[in-house]
């Protein structure tokens, strides 16, 4: 194999980026893991190695288990909800509806907004006294549907999940629509000649070929559900009480509000391990797919 004459220049341009990534990503990760095995507490970096003490404390921390439960609830509802709604919207747009470009823009617009803007918008809609939802129910005479929404600890987490699905469905719709449009037209024509209905066309031709788009979107949604800090922080700040705490919020409060850096680092390490469980199989699958 001949070496490209541009290889030295490519390496030269990559070195600064690799140095920055090495310092601010990989070194930071290793340092965080090391700190999680110490007793660093307070602004002064004075600490001693204590082994698994921070992780043992996590096991007996009820807030940690509440946060973990909320993270799992977020994964179980937000991820499939975003995938299914995105697939539904993509199929609708693929049916050659009028003003497709306009509808596509409308569906994608929520994802183009920052999480802070979206959370602020939904906080206004969920406001118990003057929010759009309660005002609308009041005007329609449906007072029994009025609720405290994000101020009700029983449903606050579900309200957050609905808002997140609304924001991310446009992203999954674009992923699926691109996958659908990449299917060769000959497959559609062959199925139509065989007398396939529209439902059979999507069930047996389209959906089975959307594995790659589904996995790509799945990984993105999973990783976001583990670190959805800014959205939830703006919307509820983890409240009422700890009803909408997730691991990222507990990590933030332990690290910056309580200056318990070692404990916050232990929570961050747990988040890292959860993310690796999702990302590593995907990278392996992608690598094997390229080899084939």
UniProtKB/Swiss-Prot annotation:
InterPro entries: ABC_transporter_permease, MetI-like, MetI-like_sf. Residues 68-284 form the ABC transmembrane type-1 domain. GO terms for biological process: transmembrane transport. Gene3D superfamilies: MetI-like. Keywords: Cell membrane, Membrane, Transmembrane, Transmembrane helix, Transport. It is a multi-pass membrane protein. Pfam families: BPD_transp_1. The chain crosses the membrane at residues 10-30, 72-92, 106-126, 160-180, 215-235, 261-281. One of its GO terms (cellular component) is plasma membrane. It is found in: Cell membrane. Probably part of a binding-protein-dependent transport system PH1214/15/16. Probably responsible for the translocation of the substrate across the membrane. Belongs to the binding-protein-dependent transport system permease family. MalFG subfamily. This is Probable ABC transporter permease protein PH1215. It comes from Pyrococcus horikoshii (strain ATCC 700860 / DSM 12428 / JCM 9974 / NBRC 100139 / OT-3).
């Amino acid at each position: 194999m001949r070496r490209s004459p541009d290889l030295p220049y490519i390496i030269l341009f990559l070195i600064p980026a690799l140095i920055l990534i090495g310092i601010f990503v990989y070194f930071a990760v290793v340092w965080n893991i090391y700190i999680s095995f110490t007793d660093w507490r307070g602004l002064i970096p004075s600490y001693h190695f204590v082994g698994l003490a921070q992780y043992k404390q996590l096991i007996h921390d009820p807030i940690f288990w509440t946060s973990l439960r909320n993270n799992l609830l977020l994964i179980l509802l937000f991820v499939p909800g975003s995938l299914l709604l995105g697939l539904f919207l993509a199929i609708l747009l693929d049916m050659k509806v009028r003003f497709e470009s306009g509808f596509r823009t409308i569906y994608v617009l929520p994802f183009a907004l920052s999480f802070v803007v979206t959370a602020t918008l939904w906080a206004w809609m969920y406001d118990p006294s003057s929010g759009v939802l309660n005002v609308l129910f009041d005007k329609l005479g449906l007072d029994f549907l009025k609720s405290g929404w994000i101020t009700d600890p029983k449903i606050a987490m579900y309200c957050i999940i609905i808002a997140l699905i609304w924001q991310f469905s446009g992203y999954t719709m674009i992923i699926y629509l691109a996958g659908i449009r990449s299917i060769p037209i000959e497959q559609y024509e062959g199925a139509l000649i065989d007398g396939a209905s529209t439902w059979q066309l999507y069930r047996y031709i389209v959906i089975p070929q959307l594995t790659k788009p589904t996995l790509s979107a799945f990984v993105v949604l999973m990783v976001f559900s583990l670190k959805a800090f800014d959205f939830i922080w703006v919307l509820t700040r983890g409240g009422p009480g700890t009803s909408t705490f997730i691991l990222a919020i507990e990590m933030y409060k332990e690290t910056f509000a309580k200056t318990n850096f070692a404990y916050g680092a232990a929570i961050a390490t747990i988040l890292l391990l959860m993310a690796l469980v999702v990302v590593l199989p995907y990278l392996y699958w992608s690598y094997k797919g390229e080899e084939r």
